[in-house]
């Protein structure tokens, strides 16, 4: 088990710099034999301010190298107050980044670009904005997403329409320079909400003639909310949903995911931003805020179900097998399964007692008063995660969260889960592709250990296998690009 760092909550196998603020993943692209992951980053402080594009790259999704800051605000320029979110493409031997240029006092963030001919180390910004003005009847405008389809370049831009609906606006181009606005690619329903909603960070994945549109719901009053996925088909420049929208992630701490089209045919990868779930004062003491999720594979089943699973490459991070237990429990007292590290990968099959709940408890204090509970509830047909006792520090946020699990309602049906825990983040995946992401902040003494528990009069059964994860493949050095030095301000 690797020696924990000074900060026991800093993730070991999730991407983020060693300190300071990060938020949205950006510019996911495979270029020159590497996966490139950019992200919103304040290199100088812990606030969402002075936003740059940070940069990691990897040849294999296992070994990561942090590169110098890619994009920095230009003092006095169109992006003086932040290089906000967007994406990147690999074209003609170069990286071309599309991003939102932020200036205080301008309600929209125009689309602009920067290009790199050396794999993302040095960047040249275009001298003027690519799309300087938003269309009429919009009240929010940011976050371009560009892809190539049928020989044409296409762009979605996140927006809010004047009538209160969120929308992804469509543009098209033959040359990446001249873009024609085609109107809303897709928009929300007025009946879905009484409050105005904007769609941030639209992403679009194609699976044959079917499409998956991912949007991040944002409200003027509360800001970032949650991520919604729409499935359907495109017809004459408009996306037609074939099913009601659903949440992409059922946890409280997941937002603004970004897609990467992998070099393999039909394979899509996704990273999200997992924000802090603790008081700002604690994050400021720690010196960092936010992390990216693990890379996930995004799939679309024949029945239209969107699924997510950890990228297959992550199996290579597994090191020592920590435990392998099988059994049934019919007593109110939990069964001790064994110790785990603070960064581990677990697979389990749970067959719940149909008259109660059956699950696992991650105990993080010697006296057992600090724990994270994960339970199957057959009556509700849901998987529930309770972090109400997951930290003895009152500055950590509590809450109970769940995701649908219809199989739990069928007596005797085993339910397969995969749980990846990395110090202060848990990603919980059903084998059917639903996922719940949350943050928690244990402070208890003693080793972490797992228990199995069941609440009904019958028996709940389990098989659990867990491995320590080796973080040795992430090389993080706090590097700054030269162009960022002249914008060094206290934030």
For every predicted segment, state its role.
Residues 1-26, 45-48, 62-90, 120-148, ...:
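Surface loop/turn signatures of beta-propeller and other carbohydrate-active proteins
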Residues 14, 36, 55:
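Histidine-centered active-site/metal-ligand motif
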Residues 21, 48-51, 81, 106, ...:
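Active-site-proximal structural scaffolding
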Residues 24-44, 48, 68-69, 84-106, ...:
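Hydrophobic core segments of beta-strands in well-ordered, beta-rich domains
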Residues 40, 58, 100, 114-116, ...:
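Predominantly extracellular/luminal cell-surface or secreted proteins
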Residues 52-60, 110-119, 168-176, 226-236, ...:
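Beta-propeller blade signature
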Residues 54-55, 86-87, 144, 170, ...:
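Hydrophobic/aromatic beta-strand elements that line small-molecule binding cavities or substrate pockets
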Residues 231-255, 260-491:
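Beta-rich accessory regions
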């Amino acid at each position: 088990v690797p020696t924990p760092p000074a900060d026991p909550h800093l993730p070991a196998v999730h991407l983020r710099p060693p300190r300071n603020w990060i938020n949205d993943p950006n510019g996911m692209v495979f270029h020159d034999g590497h996966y490139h992951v950019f992200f919103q980053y304040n290199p100088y402080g812990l606030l969402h301010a002075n936003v740059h594009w940070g940069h990691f790259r990897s040849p294999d999704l296992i070994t990561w190298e942090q590169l110098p800051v890619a994009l920095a605000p230009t003092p006095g320029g169109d992006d003086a107050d932040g290089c906000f979110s967007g994406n990147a493409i690999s074209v003609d031997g170069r990286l071309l980044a599309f991003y939102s240029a932020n200036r205080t006092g301008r309600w929209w963030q125009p689309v602009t670009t920067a290009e790199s001919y050396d794999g993302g180390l040095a960047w040249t910004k275009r001298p003027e904005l690519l799309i300087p003005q938003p269309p009429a009847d919009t009240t929010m405008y940011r976050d371009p997403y560009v892809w190539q389809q049928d020989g044409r370049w296409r762009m979605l831009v996140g927006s809010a329409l004047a009538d209160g609906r969120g929308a992804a606006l469509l543009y098209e181009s033959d040359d990446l320079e001249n873009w024609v606005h085609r109107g809303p690619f897709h928009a929300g329903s007025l009946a879905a909400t009484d409050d105005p909603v904007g769609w941030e960070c639209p992403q679009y994945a194609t699976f044959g003639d079917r499409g998956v549109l991912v949007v991040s719901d944002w409200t003027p009053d509360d800001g970032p909310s949650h991520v919604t996925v729409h499935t359907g088909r495109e017809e004459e420049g408009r996306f037609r949903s074939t099913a009601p929208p659903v949440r992409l992630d059922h946890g409280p701490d997941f937002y603004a995911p970004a897609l990467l089209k992998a070099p393999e045919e039909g394979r899509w990868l996704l990273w999200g931003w997992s924000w802090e779930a603790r008081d700002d004062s604690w994050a400021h003491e720690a010196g960092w805020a936010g992390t990216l999720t693990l890379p996930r594979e995004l799939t679309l089943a024949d029945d239209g179900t969107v699924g997510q699973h950890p990228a297959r490459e992550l199996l290579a991070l597994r090191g020592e097998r920590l435990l392998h237990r099988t059994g049934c429990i019919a007593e109110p007292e939990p069964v001790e399964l064994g110790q785990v590290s603070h960064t581990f990968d677990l697979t389990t099959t749970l067959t719940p007692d149909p008259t109660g709940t059956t699950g696992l408890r991650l105990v993080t204090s010697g006296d057992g008063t600090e724990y994270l509970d994960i339970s199957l509830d057959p009556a509700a047909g849901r998987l529930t995660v309770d972090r109400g006792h997951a930290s003895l520090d009152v500055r950590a946020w509590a809450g109970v969260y769940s995701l649908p699990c219809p199989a739990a309602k069928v007596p005797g049906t085993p339910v397969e889960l995969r749980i990846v825990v990395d110090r202060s983040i848990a990603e919980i995946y059903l084998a059917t592709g639903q996922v719940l992401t949350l943050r928690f902040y244990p402070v208890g003494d003693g080793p972490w250990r797992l228990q199995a528990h069941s609440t009904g009069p019958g028996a709940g059964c389990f098989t659990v296998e867990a491995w320590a994860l080796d973080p040795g493949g992430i090389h993080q050095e706090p590097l700054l690009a030269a162009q960022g030095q002249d914008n060094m301000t206290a934030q």
